Amino acid sequence: MAQSTALTICGLVYSPAIGQELVRLHTSDIDELVYFSSEREFCNYLEARRNSVACLILEWGEGTPQIITYLHHSATLLPAILIFPAAPAPPPAGPHYHIAEVILTTDQLDQLNRQIEEAITGFVKLCPGCAVPPHVLFRLPALKESSNVDPQHRLSQKLKERLGYLGVYYKRDTAFFFRRMSPADKRKLLDELRSIYRTIVLEYFNTDAKVNERIDEFVSKAFFADISVSQVLEIHVELMDTFSKQLKLEGRSEDILLDYRLTLIDVIAHLCEMYRRSIPREV
């Protein structure tokens, strides 16, 4: 029988009032929200179930720095929301856990569901090596080892991380899908994608360029907006047509543009891999 893999929002919450508020506010279609007030129970749960956790929610308390140290030492990298008290003083500067963490105060809990989506979206853009602060990364062998990945395989590695093959990607918020955007938002997104894709093409054969980061950015935007492969193809064709006209004006051959079919194949392969892994596995 086919069924989706259960996913969980896992919290370490010291205040019963905040725990109850999380349960009341959490209406996401992710299957389950569990939280603990005991750090030991929280860690035991992660040891047993970390591969089913979609996002962590950590209420900041006296023991939180030690919990974060435990997460770093065990190379447990997950989307995370840190909740600080609502006070006149701003929360302490981060990052505390990793650079994609989302900071909330207790008077912002009404934003919980949207911020869970933000935490997941921000996290999947990061490779394991850039997710944690550098002073942590190079001090901890487990994390350092996980960061030594051939740049050409960074997206694949990210997809195999804690979220990767467990189906979190099919939990996208359909409200942000391209087909549901206003005409103005559609134009804005397409302009952003065209700009990023143009940069990818111009830098693709430059070994010094950060082209993989550009591809990751393009694919993330396209995936979470549910952009089709045919739309990506249209962006490529439009750009090649522009370049072709420019080459003709300069009296140069268009043959060079054939090389950029590799760029298109690379981008579409990354996007298709995202979509493939968004389909729940059969068990």
Swiss-Prot record:
Key component of the KaiABC oscillator complex, which constitutes the main circadian regulator in cyanobacteria. Complex composition changes during the circadian cycle to control KaiC phosphorylation. KaiA stimulates KaiC autophosphorylation, while KaiB sequesters KaiA, leading to KaiC autodephosphorylation. KaiA binding to the KaiC CII domain during the subjective day yields KaiA(2-4):KaiC(6) complexes which stimulate KaiC autophosphorylation. Binds oxidized quinones via the N-terminal PsR domain, allowing it to sense redox changes and possibly mediate clock input. Residues 3-163 form the KaiA N-terminal domain. Keywords: Biological rhythms. Homodimer. The KaiABC complex composition changes during the circadian cycle to control KaiC phosphorylation. Complexes KaiC(6), KaiA(2-4):KaiC(6), KaiB(6):KaiC(6) and KaiC(6):KaiB(6):KaiA(12) are among the most important forms, many form cooperatively. KaiA and CikA bind to the same region of the KaiB(fs) form and therefore compete. Residues 3-133 are annotated as: PsR domain, binds oxidized quinones. The keyword Chloroplast does not apply. One of its GO terms (biological process) is circadian rhythm. It comes from the Bacteria. Residues 164-172 are annotated as: Flexible linker. The lineage of its organism: Bacteria, Bacillati, Cyanobacteriota, Cyanophyceae, Thermostichales. This is Circadian clock oscillator protein KaiA. The N-terminal pseudoreceiver domain (PsR, approximately equal to KaiA N-terminal) binds oxidized quinones. The KaiA C-terminal domain mediates interaction with KaiC, homodimerization, and is responsible for the clock oscillation function. InterPro entries: CheY-like_superfamily, Circadian_clock_KaiA, Circadian_clock_KaiA_N, Circadian_clock_protein_KaiA_C, KaiA/RbsU_helical_domain_sf. Transmembrane segments: none annotated. Residues 173-281 form the KaiA C-terminal domain. Signal peptide: none annotated.
